[in-house]
Amino acid sequence: MHDAIDEYQIGKIETGEAFRQRFGNPYAVIHRADIHGSLLEGAVETGRVEFFTNTRIEKVEQDDATKTVTAIDQNGKRWVGQALIGADGGKSVVRAQYVNDPPRVTGHVVYRAVVEKADFPDDLKWNAASLWAGPKCHLVHYPLRGGEQYNVVVTFHSRQQEQWGVTDGSKEEVESYFQGICPKARQLIELPKSWRRWATADKEPIGTWVFGRATILGDAAHPTTQYMAQGACMAMEDAVTLGEALRVTNKDWDAALALYQKNRVTRTARIVLSGREMGRLYHAAGVERLVRNSLWKGRSQERFYDAMEWLYGWNVHNCLQQG
């Protein structure tokens, strides 16, 4: 991480072999389309998953006598099963039906773009996830697909009232929020030919994810800001944990759902709340910025790893020991 004002290197975390040795897994980044494609391929290969597109679930009903759940789509068709997993995103229909809690719109806006290798500056072609922390803003870049592309993500505190959602962005807006940063970081916002704009939000963590035979997973359960870079990871952890819970309970759905909730609520709530704090650290201004820089100065890799043990030390073998 660098200071976006003066290029000062605030801290560096080794994510190569030392990271693998400590946590038992590599540190990796992946293109959104590639992870979606990989998950889709894996689901198809099981031969047990059916896909129905252009289908929007609008309501859920449950029958306690038969212990079944019915999902009703936009055409009135009824889909009946033993359980329902609402992995339907931050604006989840399932969560809205059972919890109906409002989003916490942050006022922070994220712009994202992918830049081809040939168009990316040579002096920023680092094989690392790199962050430039500025006052009320920050920039991130990292290689994708073996360095053939680079992801560029910039965040700033909006001057206007925001509505949670995604739209097309404008280069002029981005440039207006990054006037005071150093030239090396500023060149990042001049690269993309087009941007996508996210007005971000999260929700307060909730302690109940299970509603009879219905549950929620991923952003539906714990919508979070991007500051911990763990949204997709937490969704996949949820899925692994639910699968393990079904395995150890011999597919007893009631027991499995209870075990799933017990082992995921605290960890994911910590991600949501930590994300808020990381956003404050990244966007520190004035004296707070100087304090942040001094706190991480000279910190050893072991101290960084110790601080991250709770996050990166998770694996399938301890996923049912988190409650």
What positions do the PLM features span?
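Short, cationic motifs built from Arg/Lys/His that form the positively charged side of catalytic pockets
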Residues: 32, 93-96, 218, 264-268, ...
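Conserved mid-domain beta->alpha element of the FAD-binding
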Residues: 85-86, 111, 141, 194-283
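C-terminal auxiliary extensions adjacent to catalytic cores
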Residues: 297-323
